[in-house]
């Protein structure tokens, strides 16, 4: 087994895991399209029967979850827990409504976006004739593996947090809870993998410019043949065209999925507050499991932040890949057009204009979370001593 993993490259392994994540998203009813392969061309298309099956299934499971959750809230004696659980229930309604709306009304836009991603990966890969096919490198593999760990936790956490014995009723309740929670969390993972993909596209294109095109530009001068100059000119224009297409794809992705990210972040913060309250105030005997659950949600936010930061950094590195372009003024004019585009189209991920997704924001959130948990635990100990 270890020999197999050693022989398998990081890009190929990442591609295999992404294929599993695609099937997982189909299984939980978030993805309603299928992948169709025609020789070297891969496209996605809508399966109408799968879409309406997912819509019906989601309505049924959420209805069951809604009434069971109301019953569990009514028997709780702690007012704070009642409020937090009630907020989670209320917030789950727009999450489910948004998923249903995306399934019914925005399917063609999502299909166009996914096909655009696949087309860009093919075009960037064609620049490297001998490059090993796959997705990214070791950094991307590590982040995808962390996403995979998060998926595994979503499937099993309820089995360890519920103390009652297993039964058919428990299995049904677990499935309804899992179907809702996993679909909400997938918003986080879609944004994480989406911006990770944009970062890979920028990184691969930057690598080609730095290792191939830049050298060709620097060697050219006015004495070069017109055919050679024209060939390099075409490659330069091709790269600039790809930069623009990647940027426009990022805008499409932002418009489609960042509103979903906003809902998922609110839901995630509320869950973290709920779990933190249970850990710091109630002091469950199995609090270690709740600490793992808390760490899982913090990990999800970390993955989104790192993916966004990676894409932003690769975008900012575009201008530094070209260097001196030689003596031909036409190349400098073409690059000036690119640099103007970079200045006008600054790459950033803003959550509805409220804040940008950055490492600084993540660290501030983490600091606030730890301070809040410490305050609640200290208050609990003072009340207990009193």
Swiss-Prot record:
Positions in the Cytoplasmic compartment: 1-14, 101-141, 191-256, 309-356
> Matching Pfam families, A to Z?
7tm_7
- Residue spans, topological domain Extracellular: 36-79, 163-169, 278-287, 378-386
**Membrane topology label:** Multi-pass membrane protein
- InterPro entries, alphabetically? 7TM_chemorcpt (IPR013604)
Q: Which GO terms describe its molecular function?
A: ligand-gated monoatomic ion channel activity; taste receptor activity
Q: A GO CC term?
A: plasma membrane
Q: Where in the chain are disulfide-linked cysteines found?
A: none
Claim: Membrane is one of the keywords in the record: yes
**Domain of life where this protein originates:** Eukaryota
What job does the chain carry out?
Probable gustatory receptor which mediates acceptance or avoidance behavior, depending on its substrates.
What's the family? Belongs to the insect chemoreceptor superfamily. Gustatory receptor (GR) family. Gr93a subfamily.
Record protein name field: Putative gustatory receptor 92a
